[in-house]
From Swiss-Prot:
S-adenosyl-L-methionine found in the keyword field: no
Stated name of the protein: Eukaryotic peptide chain release factor subunit 1-2
Matching Pfam families: eRF1_1 (PF03463), eRF1_2 (PF03464), eRF1_3 (PF03465)
Species annotation: Brassica oleracea var. botrytis
Other comment: Plants silencing ERF1-2 show increased elongation of the leaf petiole.
């Protein structure tokens, strides 16, 4: 998967996590503000609106609710002062007083520029945060290439979301099969084959021109659909002339009754299901490749928290694969006697075991300096280790096996490593597996 696509997937994971946290938050009265400003909105407009809202809220009869609402509006106003103008992709702001699980009130504020433009405009004061508008950020904007090829010509197009675009089309005049006998028949057959070959060659060359990004030498589409009414599409897909980088991206070869734009529309309809499952297919391929490394015992794989983190620190991991719901926290702990900082990773069960928070040799208490979900740490830090980060689900058979059998964390390595030779821990850092 291209780096840009992997980065987008991580941004989507961050938004999913944020939505989950926001949706579960509850407040007393209407003290929780949800504010979304689309690109090209004016900060001055929203500042004025908040000023008007402050005046209205001053009349709320309940003193407690009035104070909470006024506090939330003030908080939103303060946050907006940090922005001279609305960022390129818009601005999302959630602020207010929420009630914790233990019944205590806590002020929270989240503000960020989305990773892609958000088209919603929203202002609501309620006892919960409204996150519905953020869902549009989770929709895939993958671009797919379409090549519609028949005996009359070829069309090159792309589809992204609901937007289809024709990149180029050209017509071709191929000789028909001939009824003449003798020498002519052979000559005509040869000419026909030659023209046909040239047609496939031209289509293959244009496909590289339209679907390979010259800057990165990588495909600029998430997948390719080949369509047509004759067997040209099959011939193209199997041809040596067709770029192998694009060959690897073929998702489907479909029969359509027409060429040109009508054929393009028909190909989109016939491929709808496979396009909606593309993430699923990519995930199956990724984990399948990982399992292949294991079955062939190449030594270019790791699994489990401990080994994966060791390999990561060494810069050996090329692709880090993590289950998107991995429930492990990363702790930075300070030895109360020596002052030494150690890093440990615990699952839910280990967090309740107090012996994990005492030094094994001296029984000195290990004080928590920092605690954060390991997934979040990966999302923030993975680039530092020169790897790509892929979040996977447990919805496919492969994904489920990866989560159950390998603890939901592993990596494919740049080079062969025997993890057993790295039993000596370095830098005084202690990694504890979640199993």
């Amino acid at each position: 998967m291209a780096d840009q696509e992997a980065d987008t997937n991580i941004e989507i994971w961050k938004i999913k996590k944020l939505i989950k946290g926001l949706e579960s938050a509850r407040g007393n009265g209407t003290s929780m503000i949800s504010l979304i400003m689309p690109p090209r909105d004016q900060v001055s407009r929203v500042t004025k609106m908040l000023g008007d809202e402050y005046g209205t809220a001053s009349n709320i009869k309940s003193r407690v609710n009035r104070q909470s609402v006024l506090s939330a509006i003030t908080s939103a106003q303060q946050r907006l002062k940090l922005y001279n103008k609305v960022p390129t992709n818009g601005l999302v702001l959630y602020t207010g007083t929420i009630v914790n699980d233990d019944g205590k009130e806590k002020k929270v504020t989240f503000d960020f520029e989305p990773f892609r433009p958000i088209n919603a405009s929203l202002y609501l004061c309620d006892n919960k945060f409204h996150t519905g508008a953020l869902n549009e950020l989770l929709e895939s904007d993958d671009k797919f290439g379409f090549i519609v090829m028949d005996g009359n010509g070829t069309l090159f197009g792309t589809l992204s979301g609901n937007t289809r675009e024709v990149l180029h089309k050209f017509t071709v005049d191929l000789p028909k099969k001939h009824g003449r006998g003798g020498q002519s028949a052979l000559r005509f057959a040869r000419l026909r084959m030659e023209k046909r070959h040239n047609y496939v060659r031209k289509t293959a060359e244009l496909a590289t021109q339209f679907y390979i990004n010259p800057a990165t030498s990588q495909p600029n589409v998430a997948g390719l659909i080949l369509a047509g009414s004759a067997d040209f599409k099959t011939e193209l897909s199997q041809s040596e002339l067709f770029d192998p980088r694009l060959q690897a991206k073929i998702l489907n070869v479909v029969d359509v009754s027409y060429g040109g734009e009508n054929g393009f529309n028909q190909a989109i309809e016939l491929s709808a299901e496979i396009l909606s499952n593309v993430k699923f297919i990519q995930e199956k391929k990724l984990i399948g490749k990982y399992f292949e490394e294991i079955s062939q015992d190449t030594g270019k794989y790791v699994f489990g928290v401990e080994d994966t983190l060791k390999a990561l620190e060494m810069g050996a991991i090329e692709t880090l694969i993590v289950w998107e719901n991995l429930d492990i926290n990363r702790y930075e702990l300070k030895n109360s006697t020596s002052g030494e900082i150690v890093v440990k990773h615990f699952g839910k069960d280990q967090e309740t075991d107090q012996s994990n928070f005492h030094d094994a040799e001296t029984n000195a208490e290990l004080e928590v300096q920092e605690k954060m979900p390991l997934l979040e740490w990966f999302a923030n830090e993975y680039k530092r280790f020169g790897c790509t980060l892929e979040f996977v689900t447990n919805k496919s058979q492969e994904g489920s096996q990866f989560c159950r059998g390998f603890g939901g964390i592993g990596g494919m390595l740049r080079y062969q490593l025997d993890m057993r030779t790295f039993d000596e821990l370095s830098d005084g850092e202690v990694y504890e597996d979640s199993d």
